[in-house]
Design a protein with these regions (language model features):
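Long, positively charged amphipathic alpha-helical accessory segments at protein N-termini or as interdomain linkers
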Residues: 6-7, 76, 82-100, 110-262
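Short loop/edge segments at beta-strand edges and connector loops
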Residues: 15, 102-104
């Protein structure tokens, strides 16, 4: 299903694996070329942002990781996560005729519930990136979530009533991401994508709560409120607090809506 000029140069498939990101890092360390895609039907040790567990059942999800060799500075690698979210929205619209939204920086949502998570990791020096891996876990055809998750997570199938062809969806995402990524490497910043991202931003012009550190561990002095105004060319969330706009970087904070997750 991949395009002829696809950014994806090679696909490695697994029935079961500990984590596609772990495998991606192993391959990158061994010199694997950029554009190699690792796909698994099931993960036994999938992880989300800040080390959180990601449940990866067989037969219902899409779990994949791209091996990347970015030419941008290490500080700009986090922008890859935002582009993956854009690619996820594009693939969902193309394959399922539904346009999701993005909860900055790395969650793609339908009707306020999460359908995927994205985790980008890198090996770098101060001014140089050796490699990065961009992993994405997608709730595609999952039919049921347990009580602790059902208020903030859903699947494409539960949201749309349409079963996802996982191979076609994987190809649609891989091709969409490749186009965004090539442009990012060419430009060096996210200027070309700010408008598109802001249109899909679920929290735009809404009040958000900013947790400096982990949400679970936040003390009152580590919590602030503001209005989300969009992103800048570096991928920071622009938050208006007491009339002045401050850029907030994704590695430092977690964002929640005033009414809950979004």
């Amino acid at each position: 299903y991949l395009e002829e000029e696809s950014f994806c140069q090679k696909v490695e498939c697994h029935d079961s694996i500990d984590s596609t990101n772990i495998r991606g890092k192993q391959l990158a360390e061994l010199g694997e070329a950029e554009g190699t895609l690792i796909v698994a039907d099931r993960q036994t040790a999938g992880r989300g942002r800040r080390g959180r567990n990601w449940i990866s059942e067989s037969g219902v999800g899409i779990y994949m990781t791209y091996v990347l060799r970015p030419t941008v500075q290490p500080a700009h690698v986090s922008g890859i996560t935002l582009l993956a979210a854009l690619a996820m929205c594009e693939a969902t619209y193309q394959e399922c005729d539904v346009l999701p939204q993005i909860k900055w920086p790395n969650d793609v949502i339908i009707d306020g519930k999460k359908i995927c998570g994205i985790l980008t990791e890198m090996s770098s020096e101060v001014q140089y990136v050796h490699y990065a891996v961009m992993g994405i876990g997608i709730n595609a055809n999952k039919e049921k979530f347990d009580e602790t998750l059902k208020d903030k997570a859903t699947s494409i199938y539960l949201s749309t009533g349409k079963k996802v062809n996982r191979a076609k969806f994987t190809a649609a995402f891989a091709d969409a991401f490749g186009g965004y990524y090539r442009r990012y490497m060419q430009d060096g910043d996210l200027s070309a994508f700010v408008e598109e991202y802001d249109e899909l931003l679920a929290n735009k012009d809404k009040e958000v709560i900013i947790y400096h550190g982990m949400v679970e561990d936040a003390t009152p002095d580590k919590i602030s409120r503001g209005i989300a105004r969009g992103i800048d060319k570096d991928g920071a969330l622009l938050v208006e607090i007491d009339g002045s706009v401050t850029p907030v970087m994704s590695g430092e904070v977690s964002i929640r809506g005033v009414q809950g997750y979004v």
